[in-house]
A protein has these predicted regions:
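Amphipathic, well-ordered alpha-helical segments in soluble domains
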Residues: 119-126, 153, 210-217
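Long, hydrophobic, well-ordered secondary-structure blocks that form the structural core
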Residues: 129-185, 237-244, 248-255
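Inter-helical turn/loop segments and adjacent helix faces that build the functional surface
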Residues: 129-141, 216-236, 250-282, 298-315
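Mid-sequence acidic-hydrophobic segments that form the walls
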Residues: 164-167, 210-225, 243
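Active-site-adjacent structural elements in folded domains
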Residues: 199-205, 216
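Alpha-helical membrane segments in multi-pass integral membrane proteins
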Residues: 230-244, 288, 292
Length: 474
């Protein structure tokens, strides 16, 4: 069970290591300062119906109650240790999993943990102003739940930095609070976490697409031979599932409401749809194209010696590594990777070790396609002739083999001029953003009420009704 009697809730017996405990208690006020400055805006006195982890067991791991967010019990929670666990891939395959950082991998592991840790506060910063335009109390509660759990995930990474990396780790933990999403001088590490999240459609797309990247990265790190990292990531994945649920159902509810209005009023033209105060399907497709493409960049270069080294060293595995049927060394294996040659997209095989970023990206794309398929069924069930599609993986890319090329959603390699002629048919324009923003000029906070542009969910949180008071405004 998790010990909530200590200043920092934990299940790692923190009280037995007084030096580590003092270091984390010294970092805690800095974290709270960051939360007050960069957490959800003007919300510190709200009492929010939130879940808090009380156990790391699969059944009954969380409890729900009203909490003021600055009083949320952020803590350090790892899955229980498996004494028989081994390194399951790379050159150390078959060795006992490491309980301490191998000296030769110290800087590499620190970089991996810092990169993951940096994403957690970044998303809170990106979303901090959205409470002012929430479409319902239910949705407001959901964004707050996502935010406090991203804060807890930051604590998870900071614990590893403090516990295993000494002064370097403490300095990195301070830097995680110093960087700011979108800051010109001190931005977050990864590009997608410096993009603005200006409206709720962008938020839902982010939690569907970009939080799902988080899932796949955590799954790869949960295979790590460094056991404390693996155990940390496994519990983070338990919390992450709700974030993706918020995104998928949020976009789905917007699509549902748009389809309802289109059917009721017998309109199809996007301008007619907009005149009725909902988000037209072509604009939803443009948002999809943007968030999907910037998230694909998070996986890094298609061919990467760093990814090969992480795997060979046993630091970061593949998605569901232990369920894959191969030698888990990959010395002679190959994997297909695409690039642009002579104005065409060409696929060729490369050493599988160097293509691990691309493999993880492909695993992600497969799962994303299933979610988009569920959105499509909402449209089909309404009898509306419109198809949501994932663009080609080379579309609108800034990192990897497709960076610097202009590729259409259908995979055609274009000239820069042709791209510019069609760019805002495929990506949101300033007018698109302005229209979506115009729908969100105020917030809807009466229990059970929802903004016109989004349908109610199928059910409430934790078996509560839709008119439950999910947030108390004190």
């Amino acid at each position: 069970m998790i010990n909530y009697t200590e200043k920092i809730p934990n299940n790692v017996d923190l009280g037995r290591d007084r030096i580590l405990q003092r270091a984390l208690e010294h970092w805690q006020p800095a974290y709270m300062g960051w939360w007050y400055d960069m957490g959800p805006n003007e919300s510190h006195n709200y009492e929010v119906y939130l879940r808090t982890a009380i156990s790391v067991e699969a059944d009954g791991w969380a409890q729900f109650d009203y909490v003021k967010m600055p009083e949320y019990r952020w803590g350090i929670f790892l899955q229980p240790r498996d004494e028989k666990r081994q390194v399951n891939f790379g050159i150390h395959k078959g060795q006992a999993a490491w309980q301490d950082v191998p000296g030769e991998y110290r800087s590499t592991l620190r970089r991996v943990i810092v990169t993951q840790g940096d994403t957690e506060p970044a998303s809170v910063e990106q979303q901090r102003m959205l409470g002012a335009s929430c479409p319902s109390m239910y949705d407001l509660r959901n964004i707050f739940q996502v935010n406090v759990e991203e804060g807890r995930h930051l604590w998870a990474m900071v614990y590893l930095l403090h516990r295993y990396f000494g002064r370097d780790g403490r300095e990195e933990a301070e830097s995680l609070l110093a960087r700011r999403s979108g800051d010109a001088d001190n931005p977050r590490i990864l590009g997608a976490f410096n993009e603005p999240t200006p409206d709720w459609l962008a938020f839902y797309m982010f939690t569907f697409f970009t939080d799902r990247d988080g899932k796949f990265q955590l799954c790869a790190l949960a295979e790590s031979g460094f056991d404390p990292l693996a155990r940390t990531c496994r519990f983070m994945l338990t919390e992450e599932a709700h974030h993706m649920f918020v995104g998928e159902t949020g976009v789905g509810r917007i699509i549902q409401r748009t389809c309802e209005v289109m059917k009721e009023n017998k309109v199809e033209d996007p301008s007619d749809v907009r005149a009725l105060g909902v988000i037209d399907l072509p604009t939803i497709q443009k948002y999809l194209n943007f968030h999907y493409s910037v998230t694909l960049d998070l996986y890094g270069s298609d061919v990467s010696s760093n990814a090969a080294n992480y795997y060979t060293s046993g630091l970061k595995g593949r998605f569901r590594e232990t369920k894959l049927d191969d030698d888990h060394v990959l010395a002679d294996a190959e994997y297909p990777v695409s690039e642009v040659i002579g104005g065409k997209v060409i696929t060729k095989n490369v050493p599988a070790l160097t293509a691990l970023n691309e493999r993880l990206r492909d695993d992600y794309i497969e799962e994303i396609a299933d979610g988009v398929g569920r959105w499509q069924r909402v449209i089909d069930n309404a009898g509306i002739r419109f198809r949501l599609t994932l663009p080609h993986k080379g579309f609108h890319r800034a990192i990897g083999n497709f960076a610097g090329h202009f590729i259409s959603p259908d995979g055609e390699v274009l000239s820069e001029e042709a791209w510019k002629n069609h760019e805002f048919e495929w990506l949101p324009s300033s007018k698109d953003y302005a229209y979506v923003q115009s729908l969100m000029s105020g917030r809807v906070v009466e229990p059970g009420k929802f903004a016109n542009w989004i349908a109610p969910p199928a059910r409430g949180i934790n078996n509560q009704s839709l008119n439950f008071e999910y947030v108390r405004f004190n």
